[in-house]
């Protein structure tokens, strides 16, 4: 099997940017990575995810329980694996993914009491990696961002238009719980944590993409060598 490396973090943490920069830098070093991302909005397999995020099943993330929501995302990943990148993985290719099963761990744990997190994670990984047959990641890069900074970045993405946010992005309490769940998962599962928040003139802000990427590449070069 090939290598599967995941970029994980809250909304607005720069996962897509860092995954893309990592692919560019890895190309320059002689690797041939395939970049994938989830949800796969260009595929019909993401239909239930779109319905969930647009509020068709309820206007709050908690209106769909952790197990049901997880299956929406898992089926999307299964379809992507079977149609797009499974062969690359089986032929020892290098896959760089913006989100993965790890996102279910973060965003669905946040719907449950902390005492139930371990049981949920056990179910989730058994379901996706064993029952569905998806490959487990070889490494996870967790981009840690202060929730307030994350919210500002999301607002900038939509130019202040709140109507463009999905039900998760609109729910600040849910995002705070997701941050707590992400930190727990990072510790428990051995993710490589990169702190992306810094303070400039007394205000919390995100580090530059290039600054974060230098730390990302130092880690990737170590695990790929």
Task: Cite the ranges covered by each PLM segment.
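Hydrophobic positions on the alpha1 helix immediately C-terminal to the Walker A/P-loop
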Residues: 18
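A glycine- and Lys/Arg-enriched "phosphate-lid" helix/loop adjacent to the NTP-binding pocket
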Residues: 102-180
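Hydrophobic anchor at the beta1->P-loop junction of P-loop NTPases
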Residues: 7
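ATP-dependent small-molecule kinase phosphotransfer cores
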Residues: 31-126, 130-132
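Pre-Walker A (Motif I) flank of P-loop NTPase domains
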Residues: 1-4
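NTP-dependent small-molecule kinase module
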Residues: 23, 148-225
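P-loop (Walker A) phosphate-binding loop of NTP-binding proteins
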Residues: 10
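Conserved lysine of the Walker
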Residues: 15
């Amino acid at each position: 099997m090939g290598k599967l490396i995941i970029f994980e973090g809250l909304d607005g943490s720069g996962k897509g940017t860092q995954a893309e920069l990592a692919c560019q830098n890895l190309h320059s070093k002689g690797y041939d990575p395939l970049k994938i991302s989830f949800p796969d909005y260009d595929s019909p397999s993401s239909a239930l995810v779109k319905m969930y995020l647009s509020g068709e099943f309820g206007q709050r993330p908690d209106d769909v329980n952790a197990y049901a929501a997880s299956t929406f995302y898992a089926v999307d990943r299964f379809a992507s694996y079977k149609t797009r990148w499974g062969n690359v993985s089986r032929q020892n290719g290098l896959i760089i993914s913006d989100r993965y099963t790890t996102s279910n761990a973060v965003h669905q744990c946040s719907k449950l009491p902390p005492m139930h997190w371990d049981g949920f994670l056990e179910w989730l990984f058994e379901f996706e990696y064993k029952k569905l047959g998806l490959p487990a990641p070889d490494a996870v890069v967790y981009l840690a961002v202060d929730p307030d900074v994350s919210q500002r970045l999301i607002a900038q993405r939509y130019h202040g238009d709140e109507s463009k946010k999905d039900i998760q992005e609109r729910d600040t309490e849910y995002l705070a719980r997701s941050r707590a769940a992400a930190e727990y998962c990072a510790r428990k599962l051995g993710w490589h944590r990169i702190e992306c928040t810094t303070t400039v003139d007394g205000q919390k802000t995100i580090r530059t993409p290039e600054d974060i990427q230098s730390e990302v590449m130092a880690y990737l070069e170590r695990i790929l060598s």
